[in-house]
């Protein structure tokens, strides 16, 4: 009986742990992010304000401000679930927030850990 209970508990724990891991997103360095977005099927999402975006952004990024109350609705109706979403913000905080929201909806997400500031500091190409 004890073995059955322990076995059942182990299966439940494995299932819970597996689900938690599949619900995660990856935070990438500038170099790893640059490699990831070289894949043209990856959608680049900038979650800063429109003013920040216009001042400069990563090439081919689309802009949906995570601080807008309608972010979740706009993102889930705009972004296809079949694509990996590469998120950036200014420094990395807002992109993590956006990543958590999108992961809850089943998206595969990567985010730029150091944000747009890290991208610029590394001398990477920007668009204005």
Regions found by a protein language model. Give the residues of each.
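Repetitive helical segments and hydrophobic/amphipathic motifs
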Residues: 12-13
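Rhodanese-like catalytic fold shared by cysteine-dependent sulfurtransferases
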Residues: 2-7, 16-42, 51-84, 93-128
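Short, surface-exposed ligand- or partner-binding patches at beta-edge/loop junctions that are enriched
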Residues: 88
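Structural scaffold elements adjacent to functional motifs in cytosolic proteins
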Residues: 44-46
């Amino acid at each position: 009986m004890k073995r059955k209970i322990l076995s059942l508990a182990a299966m439940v724990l494995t299932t819970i742990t597996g689900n938690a891991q599949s619900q995660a997103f990856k935070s990438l360095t500038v170099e790893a992010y640059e490699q990831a977005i070289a894949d043209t099927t990856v959608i680049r999402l900038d979650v800063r304000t429109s003013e920040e975006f216009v001042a400069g952004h990563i090439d081919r990024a689309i802009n949906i401000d995570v601080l807008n109350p309608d972010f979740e609705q706009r993102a889930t109706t705009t972004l296809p679930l079949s694509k990996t979403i590469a998120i950036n913000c200014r420094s990395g905080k807002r992109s993590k927030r956006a990543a958590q929201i999108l992961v809850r909806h089943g998206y595969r997400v990567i985010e730029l850990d150091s944000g747009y500031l890290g991208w610029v500091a590394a001398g990477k190409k920007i668009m204005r």
